[in-house]
Amino acid sequence: IGYQPENTLMFCCMASEEWGVADSQFDWSTGAYEQVFTVHPEWRGSVIADLNFELPALAHGTRARIRSTFEYVSFLEEFLEELPSLTGAYPEETRITAPIETWSDDFSIAIAGIPSMVNDFTGGSFMETNYHSQFDNDGFYDEDVYRMHHELFGLLLMAIDRTVVVPLDFSRVFRKARERLDSEWCEKTGADGQRLLRVLEQATATAQQLYAKVEKTNRNARHADASAAGVENASGLCTAETGDAGAVNGDFTTCVQGTDTAAEVPAADTRKLERSLLQVFQQEQDTYVRIDWYGNVLFPHGILQDRLQLLEGAVRNLKEGRLSAALRKLYEIDSNRYAFLFEEEVYRHFTSYALDQSADRLKWGTGRIIGFENFFPVVTGLLEKEKMGCSDFTEEIAQLEAAYERQSDLYRKEIDTL
């Protein structure tokens, strides 16, 4: 009776999920951040999965969703294909979505190098009408949803526990990064997008080969003796020279060269391979995971491309005399919407508290926002000219063009280092 796990299972109740540090942009999920970065740093590089639960007794939309880091999506989709019938809580079948978001503790855990997932809770009207209000009460408790989530994640926990190598598929990250790369902006800014495109394509193919090896090892080993596979030593995986391929991408351009990609991994090498995979996962989090001013998880080159697009459009609008259109674009850049509504002291405070503090205060937001541009003088100057009916925007155009050049330079450097 019961279940005897192969791995150590830890059950954590995190503190300070909603608030944990005063006067910081990143004041939530501080308990989870401190738990893994300060209290238990030894978890990093050894824990193979974090399963987070948010409102598991509430129906969110018409189906259950598991929101995951990109690297676990392949395994999760395969898991759903073999899922037995569960308590009928939703009219539609369960789906996987990615990436994870900053709104729950799994983000703090993931950037520490621990692959994470959560029952997706951001869908449905409840989040807009009841969540975090006096209208959020036990009347929304749904017994079937609660039971279904226990069944779903209980089976998932056992499926992960049965793996002998952490089932991370890095190809999806490389593919998504490639899809987000805009060749037009590479051409406009002089960034070497073709090099990055080649590297990402090669990394995608090689990561798929590596995952096939891991998948076969897990499928055939389960609780059996994996040492019976009798294949060549695989300890060289993910340790070859990276050349000019970049800190993360290069690990995949050569990591399966010289190995039989159809073969399983010998039992003696599974832990070594697992450590390598978790190390690469950490590198991917450090390299590819950035956030915009409002906590949305994005690729770094995607953030810069969007900012360049808005800047280019604002300059064009001003040259055409379309002031309102230019202001709408500036409103969308970083925190500059504050410049439309508040005095400069307020603007500077709410900019500084997200950028100019130590890591112990910025927590999981440390270094995640890139390329901020202060357009308070530009915005207030344009608003004043709008009141006066002035149509000479020469000064503001010059300031925006200078910002465009700074962003272009940052974009080139980012493309060169990915």
Residue map of PLM features:
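Secretory-pathway/membrane protein signature
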Residues: 1-418
